[in-house]
Amino acid sequence: MKVLSIVGARPQFVKLAPIAHALVPGGHEHVIVHTGQHYDANMSDVFFEDLDIPAPNVHLGVGSGSHGVQTGAMLSAMDGVLDEHRPDWVLVYGDTNSTIAGALSAVKLHFPLAHLEAGLRSFNRRMPEEHNRVLTDHAADLCLAPTQTAMDHLVREGLGERAVLVGDVMTDVCLSVAAQVRDSAPLLPEGVDGSADYLVSTIHRAENTDDPEQLRSIIDALAALPIPVVLLAHPRLVSRAATAGIDLKRGALRPTAPLGYPQMVAAVLHSRGVVTDSGGLQKEAFLLGAPCTTLRTETEWTETVDLGWNVLRPRVDDLAAVVMRPRPTPSTASPYGDGRAAEATVATLMKHLR
C-alpha cells in the first residue's frame, strides 16, 4: 500500500509521527509532502527530529500568506506531486489550509482521500478551520474519526457509511512522550522555577490576535496572574503584538519560543495548568492531567469540558479566579482511545484499499 501524507503545520507533524511509525511494520510505502505552511524551524524541523519522523520526500515551500494565497499555492504545486507518486491513499490531517488543499487536489485528480481527525466540529462558522474540516469530510472517501462524538457528527451529516472510529493519533504520541519525560525537569525560561506553580499559555487564533484591543486585554490579564506564565510565543502572536506595540515581557509573563514536542509535554506535565486558544493543547492538557482554561466560546474537544478539565472563557475579566480553580477529580475516562489509533488507522486504510 502506498500512502501519501500531506502536512504543513505543527499539530499535523505530531499526528504524522505515529502514522509514519505504524506504516513501517507492514512494509508500506509512505510519501511525506510538507507544504511549508509552518516554515519556522521551531514550528517544523524540530518536530521531525524530536518525534523521529522521516524527512519529507517533497517540500512545497509555500510559506506565509493569506488563506487564499497560501491555499492556492499549495493547489498549484500539488497536482504534479500526486501525478508523479500516484498513491493508493492521500491522507490529510486535521483542519489547516494544507488539509483542504490536499483534499481538493486528491478529489479533482481522482485519488482516494482519507481524512484523519474527521468529524470534529466547533459549529463556529467564522473559524477558517471549521470550513476546512467540514469540506474535507464531505470530499473524503474515508473519514477517520477520533472520538464517538466526532462519529455522531459524521452520521448526522450523512457520512456514516464512510466513517470509521479509529481513535485519536495525538493521544498515541502524547502518552508515549509523557512516559519518557515524566521524570525530567521541564525546559523553562529564566525566572520560572519548575518545582513551583506556573502556567503554560499559547495564544495564536485570529480572533484573539488580529484585534489589537482583544489581544491587549488577553496579554494584560495573563500578565496580572499571581503565578508565572510560560508564554509559548507563536510567530503570529509575536508579529501582532509588535505591530500593536504590546509588550509580552511584563508582569507574570515569561515568553519563550515554541518548544519541541517533548519539551512542551514536560512543561505541561509539571504545570499548574494551561491557558490557551489552541485545539490540540486543550486535549493534551487533559491527557497530561493539567486543568485547561480555553479563551474561546466553543471547543471541538467537548469531552474535556464534560469531564471537568476544561473551562471555556472568552472573556478575561475574571481570568485569575478561573485559572487558579481547584484541580478536578482525576478521571478514568479515555474518550480519545487507548494509544493505538495509528495502528487502527493503517488497518482501516488496508481494509478499504481499492
Where do the protein language model's features map onto the residues?
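Active-site and donor-binding regions of nucleotide-sugar-utilizing enzymes
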Residues: 4-7, 13-24, 47, 59-158
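Donor-nucleotide binding loops and adjacent catalytic segments primarily
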Residues: 37-40, 45, 65, 182-270
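A nucleotide-sugar donor-handling region in carbohydrate enzymes
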Residues: 38-42, 61, 139-211, 332
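Leloir-type glycosyltransferase catalytic cores
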Residues: 48, 149, 311-354
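Short acidic-hydrophobic, aromatic-tinged amphipathic segments that line or gate anion-handling sites
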Residues: 60, 145, 255-257, 310-315
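Glycine-rich phosphate-binding loop signature in dinucleotide/nucleotide-binding domains
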Residues: 81-88, 193-194, 270, 352
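A donor-sugar binding/catalytic signature common to diverse glycosyltransferases
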Residues: 92-93, 143, 264-304
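Nucleotide-sugar donor-binding patch of glycosyltransferase catalytic domains
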Residues: 286-330
